[in-house]
A protein has these predicted regions:
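Hydrophobic alpha-helical signal peptides and transmembrane signal-/tail-anchor segments
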Residues: 1-4, 10
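Intrinsic-disorder-associated, low-complexity terminal segments enriched in Asp/Asn/His/Tyr and depleted
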Residues: 5-6, 17
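Flavin-dependent oxidoreductase catalytic cores
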Residues: 30-397
């Protein structure tokens, strides 16, 4: 208010012929913040995100026996301090056998819950919503960390038996992901579903407010859904509805265990990038089934079912935003867009043009945990709304 009076006093010294520029001068002097769709709040069920910027779930490979470490507090906490509205914890295994590597996160025991509680509490204290992605790696589990080659581990190297809808290895050249998965019987399917439910209950105890089911990138649930992998002839194979049965049954059980007032999200690979694989149209149909059983939002990624998708992914990630828009329009579900979203105006346009409800950033956030703050400045948005009080005081303008 004091600034306003000083501005008026200054303008009163202007000559009469300059009176017509007063409104423009007042607006300029007061530096009224711009309206931004990217920095508008979003309410989903009982939670409200302060903006539409989310941190994509990114494997860190830093857990010990599935237990989060100081690394995770730093990685996840810094993104909340940096201004993100949603911070999603990496693919978190529902069982020891569901991990990608021995260093992956887990939620199959209470020790893991206790390690996550201070992390989610800190994320909330900084104004962000903590989410977690629950996953089972399936035939892409029992691997070395990426910087160690990412190959399947033998038992002597600390590996474990893997499972899938069929007994086909991921790689057929016997070099990288060479292990043949155990063909899952109905009792194995039920066991994994129960593990997802138990992990969801632990996620709630750990303090998470958004839950994402990982059905993408060739991991277990996606491998059931994809005709490139699922060659079963029982009621879990064949038609799209049968191949979706594992995902749908698992989701129904999780929805019953996860509070109705909290959001439930599913990540889908919107295309397999391979002829004869899943298409965008297939996934839109799956999304309508998921909507009917209580899913609130779809996280739209792509690829990963087979080795043939590796090269296609690199050239097609930018198309995922359009897929999120198509799904959003056709299904009526909220969508998350992810993949090569790096620029502030790009993210603003995605939200403003109703292509997605949330943009998820991965590598951009690794490069710059303060990406949201810097984006706000670039877009002319008042930054203090997403900054801690000390930062507001010294660098908030």
């Amino acid at each position: 208010m004091l600034l306003f009076y000083h501005t008026i006093a200054r303008l009163l010294t202007l000559s009469i012929d300059r009176v017509m520029v007063w409104p423009i001068a007042i607006i300029s002097a007061l530096e009224i913040p711009k309206m931004s769709q990217l920095f508008s709040p979003l309410t989903v069920k009982s939670i409200t995100l302060r903006n539409r910027i989310g941190v994509a779930p990114m494997c860190q490979y830093q857990a010990i026996d599935g237990v989060a470490q100081a690394w995770h507090m730093t990685q996840l906490g810094s993104k909340a301090v940096g201004g993100a509205g949603l911070v999603i914890t990496e693919a978190t295994a529902v069982s020891p056998e569901g991990r990608i590597t021995p260093s992956c996160m887990g939620l199959w025991n209470h020790t893991q819950v206790e390690a996550l509680q201070p992390i989610t509490a800190f994320i909330k204290s900084q104004g962000a919503v903590p989410g977690v992605q629950l996953a089972h790696a399936g035939r892409k589990g029992s691997c070395a960390e990426p910087w160690l080659g990412g190959k399947h581990l033998t038992d002597a190297q600390g590996g474990w038996d893997i499972m899938g809808p069929a007994d086909q290895p991921f790689d057929d050249d016997g070099v990288r992901l060479w292990k043949a998965p155990k063909h899952m019987q109905h009792n194995h399917i039920e066991q994994v579903q129960d593990e997802f439910v138990a992990a969801a209950q632990r996620a709630l105890e750990a303090g998470y407010e958004l839950l994402e089911i990982h059905c993408a990138h060739g991991y277990l649930l996606h491998s059931f859904l994809s005709p490139l992998v699922n060659t079963r002839t029982d009621n879990y194979g064949g038609s799209l509805k049968n191949r979706a049965r594992m995902l749908l049954e698992t989701t129904i059980k999780i929805r019953a265990a996860w509070p109705q007032e909290l959001p439930l999200v599913v990540r889908l690979s919107m295309t397999d990038w391979v002829q004869g694989g899943l298409s965008v149209e297939d996934n839109i149909e799956v999304a309508t089934w998921l909507k009917a059983i209580g899913v609130d939002m779809i996280d739209c990624s792509a690829g990963g079912a087979t080795p043939a998708a590796r090269s296609a992914i690199n050239g097609g990630i930018a198309q995922q935003v359009g897929m999120a828009a198509d799904l959003r329009q056709a299904s009526g579900l909220m969508s998350m867009a992810v993949g090569e979203i790096t620029q502030a105006q790009q993210a603003e346009d995605i939200i403003a043009h109703h292509q997605a409800d949330i943009v998820l950033l991965a590598r951009a956030m690794l490069h710059d945990p303060y990406w949201p703050t810097h984006a706000a400045k670039e877009l002319g948005v008042e930054m203090s709304q997403i900054m801690p009080p000390l930062h507001q005081l010294f660098i908030g303008r």
